[in-house]
Regions:
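Short amphipathic helical patch at the helix-1/turn junction of helix-turn-helix
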Residues: 79, 113-114
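Conserved catalytic-core motifs of GNAT/GCN5-like acyltransferases
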Residues: 111-112, 124-146
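Conserved GNAT acetyl-CoA-binding A-motif
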Residues: 100-111
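A short beta-loop-alpha structural element at the N-terminal edge
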Residues: 1-11
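Conserved acetyl-CoA-binding loop-helix of GNAT-fold acetyltransferases
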Residues: 79, 85-98, 121-125
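Acetyl-CoA-dependent GNAT
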Residues: 10-76, 80-82, 93, 152
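Short alpha-helical
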Residues: 4, 69, 117-118
Length: 153
């Protein structure tokens, strides 16, 4: 992971980063923490970052984590504000799903905030189904106010 990749990730996840800024002393600390997280994340072969590009520009991305053999978890699915409602998120989810299927994935879970209707629709359009299971993320943490969705491949 080089500085250019980290800078592109900051741009891609600008909204999420702004939401997290209050958890740090300042923006520099937050960016340093995120850069360290990203480097560690990518070094793990069971964790991947995927991006969709348009004319060599990153327009959306997601992180995928293999929580157990054949079971993957999508997190941080985000499209840049100026690129939304153009189908890029669906395209990315479908590309990543096909890639993971090719390496043996059987199931993909994701957790979506109950009020994020556009994300719920996007995932549903890609075949994800709402479950009645507790919204536990790939790190084993319960995320209140969210819904667990699953795609059986």
């Amino acid at each position: 992971v080089n500085e250019q990749v980290i800078e592109k990730m900051f741009l891609l996840y600008a909204e999420s980063m702004a939401d997290m800024e209050g958890e740090f002393k300042n923006r520099d600390e937050m960016e340093a923490s995120y850069a360290a997280f990203l480097k560690e994340f990518i070094e793990n072969p069971k964790q991947m970052v995927f991006v969709e590009t348009v004319e060599k520009q990153w327009v959306c991305g997601l992180r995928a984590v293999e929580s157990e053999p054949g079971k993957w978890f999508f997190e941080a699915v985000e499209t840049m504000p100026g690129q939304r409602n153009r189908g890029y998120g669906k395209k990315l989810i479908r590309h990543v799903t096909e890639f993971l299927k090719g390496i043996g994935a059987k199931k993909i879970d994701c957790i979506i905030v109950k009020s994020n209707l556009s994300s719920i629709k996007m995932h549903s359009d890609c075949g994800f189904k709402e479950t009645k299971e507790p919204p536990v993320n790939c790190w084993g943490e319960l995320e209140e106010g969210r819904i667990l969705f699953r795609l059986e491949i």
